[in-house]
Amino acid sequence: MDAKITNSNENKANPVNYSTQGFTGDPKFWSKPYFLNKMKNMKRLYGLFVLLCLMLTACNDDFLDVDPVDRYSDAVVWTDESLITSFVNNIYEGQKWGFHTVMLSSLCDESMEVWAWESQPVVMSELSPSYQGILAPNFWIITFHNITWTNLYKNIRACNIFFENAEKYALEGDVVDKLKGEVHYLRAYFYYWLLSQWGGIPLIEKSFTPSDDLLVARNTFEETVDFIVKDLDEAASILPLNGDKARATKGAAMALKARVLLYAASDLFVSQSLWASGYEHPELIGYVGGDRTERWQRAKKAAKAVMDLGIYHLYGENGGWKNREEATQNYADIFLCHNSDEDIMVQYYDYVNHNSSDFQLPRVGLFNSPNGFHGWGGNTPTGQLVDSYEMADGSKFSWDNPQQAAYPYQNRDPRFYASIMYNGSYWRQRPDDTVGSDPEGIVQTAYYQQSDGSYTPGLDTRQGPIEDWNGSYTGYYMRKFLDPSVNHQYDKQPYPWRQIRYAEVLLNYAEACIELGEDVEARKYINMIRKRAGMPDIPNSETGDVLKEHYRNERKIELAYEQHRYFDIRRWMIAPEVIKNVQGIDIRYPYGVTEPNYSIIDVQERKWNDKSYLLPIYLDEMQKNDLLIQNPLY
């Protein structure tokens, strides 16, 4: 018989919590004076207790039948539409939020985290089963907690509990059916993060109880991919085409499927012998057979299916900007609005009900704006990222070009000005206590020589007069995502994190086309993104590996700081080439001279080891489950 779905608070659970306290083990308890005194007090308390019980019984014989107000029985939860929705809402909170203190960009070649909060072991390839650094599930900063092995499986268990109770109570109805689709999406999302970090992992479809066999072996990489795709197909078949973009929709499920299939088809997962030679279980970390061309075709088809929905569009896709400033503002506005046709899946943060310390809140402006504006300057762009932005005419920037080296921040890709703060760029009016030092709000990361030969540091350097414990080592600050109208020292900006946007889908489609040799089709969609950005088309002469290299740089620029590059450099197997010492810029103005000297400097050591293509499984997980097989080279 189908369960009746209600929307009431009736029939709360009536569980009885029995708790007992034994006598203390303190020897003084049993000393005669202490014991007698305690006994006298206990007698008095007993008398008061009996009297109270008699009074309460006289007033209301049903007193003990009053329901607890803070708990619900399973039967109530799973027959109340609002409570079921609340349960699913809690699962949504398990998504990886991108705006926490340390961003995923600082674990690859996009940015550098300035606080030394144990991100260095990641970029030095020093992680081990017993040491996870900032990626540890119990690390004091929660920035990566949601993507740890422990918490991903915790959220998968919540998804499985939902499905078990949906079956147990025969839940039905439009709202519940939609929630089923959402939970299929969410379970696939959590498994996607596991797959991307560890390869094939145990696929769990039930919520374990203490009586269950908790020892589960890893599934193969291929089985894991297929499971995720199956969940996403199921989600897409249930979910509506349109709806709240902070909740899963048909388009979100289809777009995540396209991403998963693109990742799975990539070099890393067919090249085990190149980086994990001798590993006895290559099926856990990639495909061991099959048709790779067919996998690229599946990835292409999945991305094209999202495009064919016809409901997503690039923000400002027509381009035609009058000047660079218009193109720059359009790109900035993608991330400074609540909703657009480019958004496929977004994530808001509930600042009201999660009012924890600044360290734990996703305050992107406070964490990343310059220290001279009382920001923390946390995830500062690397010199390598800055140099990857093309010139406005589509040519590469190079420090070997004298004209470009003399004026490195002129005539660059409009996205550069929307993404990077550099010396001399305007940000916003400085706070009241510092505005006297700089009424114009100009970023100052240079050093100015005085008549005695000494140098005065700019307001936004780590040696400056404002918050010198924060600030950039590279000479740059992140501008992308930051609203200049917000006083980030005190206020929070309200815009969502973009989990999936349409530009990624177009890039995913173009990448699959390149791998299939369909260069004309690939250029068409890459150029759509470049047109929106105010950049010229990729020339038709670019084909094959040259086009692939250009595409990869375009993806790096368009999706900078959006949690893609960390995985891209691994799946393309270019990490050994790009994980190098972080470069910064030292800018010095000689005394009485208006044009500075620029020097490229190394500001952080980084090293690559092939074991870092995948993460190690935590030692405590290995010890709890002897069926688990560790990833290679750990």
Residue positions per predicted region:
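An aromatic- and glycine-enriched ligand-binding surface/loop that stacks and positions planar moieties
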Residues: 11-14, 31, 60-125, 199-201, ...
